[in-house]
């Protein structure tokens, strides 16, 4: 070090200034890292919420068809028969039995139940037409919302029809067909043809190495035959692209042509003409109302057939179909049909479970925390209890479900030695009871409440206790009158956060039998019930595509419930801190 550096003040020393700049840059980088972490967390949260909301948007509305029923009786069977008759009558009363069956599937049998209840409540004159709005089936609802299959519409006015031949501009439909065939060729090449070639070449190399292996030769012959079949399919698709006229079947996109209120289905198509057959007969053709529908997904690959699409389009043209808020989502219990399913039974079950959990875990947890923090002697036994409470908070929730199923539902049978008898420990409670679910979740939440309450009690200054004791208060009075009021914001926050965690649990409830299908509202804590997280799990495993937005909607409702609980914790903390 030079002598000049020793005589320089520390604030002007170059080495010191260099280190200060480095420390300042490190501090600034750390702040940027913190802001980046917060931004990433918020971005992930927003992405999750937006994706769930986007998926659930279609679940909050449903389409209903307006019908005029000619009732013969008010029982459910007669009402459903009248609904089917009204649909078939409005659709032209087709003679084809298969078409009539497909039309009857546009509404669920459960729709008759709601109408029957309304009829029995209000009464009706059976001699007059009874107007009703009936929810369409889940697949029909998805089609009307544009979720079932891509549908392309073209103007077909000014057409010329001669028998089964219709002349119009079908160039737009032909472009869709060519694009669809090219996509099919690309899919077959990547998913079938290239893997089949690799398998054939691999077997060929093995056959060259072992020319006498008959089993290998048979496998090679089968692989070569598979390649030939795929090549034939590819050649057929390529020929269709170059053909001027395409023959249509159930394995190709459908072309439906509306002339007035009559509908025709194309069996072959070219750029300027189609040959069609009637789907549902209607009024005479009207050249001013022609419309071409190209349904991109083949009929064999979708769950809504062409006949149902024709009926829905005809009802829409007549103004019989309208979209309404899906009140069943909030007012109905679970159902096997998505259009009538709701979260009310799961929400009521969750409320019952959380009330039982709160009644057991909160007072016991706060009392245990007060004793351990204020009255318990500091010895090995107390330390052992505290360590095990911390360990219980880290146990997976499914273990508490196993404990609840073994102790509260099934019971533990202990054989008594030297005596022909057994001792039964626990058991006797029913599977799927909210009471059992509340007890299990109370055991799971108890360590969290104890830890949070002890932390809140420990944060109270010791001078408060000393001042109260100096004024002559007992230890119990000190805790009740001074310590607990000051610690109550932290205690309430920890308790509500623990309850919010409990309301979102699924695994413990599955193990105690709350996974059953519950179509009625539970009336008490000892009735079979389900919970909102379990309902979400059940809906997510059902095969129909209509359950996907329903599941997302139920997730949003559960998130709102948890948001309300967490908001309540914040408000109570702010109130008691004042």
Predicted regions and their residues:
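Membrane-topology segments of multi-pass transport proteins
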Residues: 1-33, 39, 52-339
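Alpha-helical membrane-interface segments at transmembrane helix boundaries
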Residues: 30, 34, 335, 340-356, ...
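Loop-to-helix entry region at the N-terminal start of transmembrane alpha-helices
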Residues: 340-357, 410-448
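Transmembrane-helix boundary motif in ABC transporter permease subunits
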Residues: 357-389, 402-403, 410, 569-575
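Transmembrane alpha-helices
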Residues: 450-452, 461, 475-513
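C-terminal transmembrane helix and the adjacent membrane-cytosol boundary/short C-terminal tail
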Residues: 454-462, 469, 496, 500, ...
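Glycine-rich helix-loop "coupling/hinge" segments at transmembrane-helix boundaries
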Residues: 502-545
């Amino acid at each position: 070090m030079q002598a000049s550096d020793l005589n320089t003040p520390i604030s002007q020393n170059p080495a010191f200034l260099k280190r200060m700049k480095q420390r300042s840059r490190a501090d600034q980088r750390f702040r940027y890292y913190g802001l980046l972490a917060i931004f990433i967390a918020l971005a992930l949260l927003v992405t999750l919420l937006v994706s769930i909301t986007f998926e659930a948007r279609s679940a909050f509305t449903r389409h209903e068809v307006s019908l005029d029923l000619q009732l013969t009786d008010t029982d459910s069977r007669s009402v459903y028969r009248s609904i089917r008759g009204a649909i078939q009558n409005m659709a032209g009363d087709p003679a084809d039995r298969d078409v009539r069956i497909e039309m009857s599937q546009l509404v669920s049998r459960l729709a008759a139940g709601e109408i029957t209840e309304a009829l029995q409540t209000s009464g009706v004159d059976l001699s007059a037409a009874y107007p009703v709005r009936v929810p369409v089936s889940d697949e029909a609802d998805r089609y009307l919302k544009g979720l079932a299959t891509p549908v392309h519409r073209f103007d077909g006015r000014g057409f010329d029809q001669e028998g089964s031949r219709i002349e119009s501009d079908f160039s737009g439909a032909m472009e869709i067909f060519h694009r669809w065939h090219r996509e099919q060729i690309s899919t077959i090449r990547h998913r079938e043809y290239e893997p089949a070639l690799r398998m054939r070449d691999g077997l060929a190399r093995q056959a060259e190495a072992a020319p006498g292996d008959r089993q290998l030769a048979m496998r090679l012959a089968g692989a070569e035959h598979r390649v030939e079949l795929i090549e034939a399919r590819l050649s057929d698709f390529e020929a269709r692209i170059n053909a001027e006229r395409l023959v249509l079947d159930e394995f190709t996109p459908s072309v439906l042509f509306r002339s007035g209120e009559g509908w025709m289905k194309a069996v072959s198509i070219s750029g300027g003409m189609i040959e069609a057959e009637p789907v549902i007969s209607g009024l005479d053709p009207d050249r001013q109302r022609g419309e071409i529908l190209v349904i991109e997904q083949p009929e064999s690959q979708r769950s809504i057939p062409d006949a149902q699409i024709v009926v829905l389009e005809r009802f829409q043209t007549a103004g019989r179909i309208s979209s309404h808020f899906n009140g069943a989502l909030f007012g109905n219990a679970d159902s096997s049909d998505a259009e009538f399913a709701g979260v009310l039974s799961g929400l009521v079950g969750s409320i019952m479970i959380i009330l039982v959990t709160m009644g057991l875990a909160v007072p016991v947890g706060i009392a245990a925390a007060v004793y351990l923090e204020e009255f318990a002697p500091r010895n090995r036994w107390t330390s052992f209890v505290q360590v095990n409470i911390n360990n219980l908070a880290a146990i997976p929730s499914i273990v508490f479900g196993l404990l609840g199923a073994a102790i509260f539902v099934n019971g533990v049978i202990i054989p008594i030695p030297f005596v022909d008898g057994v001792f039964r420990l626990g058991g006797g409670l029913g599977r799927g009871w909210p009471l059992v679910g509340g007890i299990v979740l109370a055991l799971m939440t108890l360590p969290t409440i104890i830890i949070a309450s002890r932390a809140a009690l420990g944060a109270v200054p010791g001078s408060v206790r000393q001042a109260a004791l100096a004024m002559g208060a007992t230890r119990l009075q000190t805790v009740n009158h001074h310590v607990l009021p000051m610690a109550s914001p932290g205690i309430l926050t920890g308790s509500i956060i623990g309850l919010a965690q409990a309301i979102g649990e699924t695994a413990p409830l599955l193990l105690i039998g709350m996974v059953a299908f519950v179509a009625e509202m539970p009336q008490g804590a000892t009735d079979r019930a389900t919970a909102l997280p379990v309902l979400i799990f059940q809906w997510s495993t059902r095969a129909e595509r209509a359950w996907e937005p329903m599941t997302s909607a139920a997730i949003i409702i559960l998130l709102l419930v948890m948001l309300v609980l967490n908001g309540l914790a914040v408000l109570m903390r702010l109130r008691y801190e004042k």
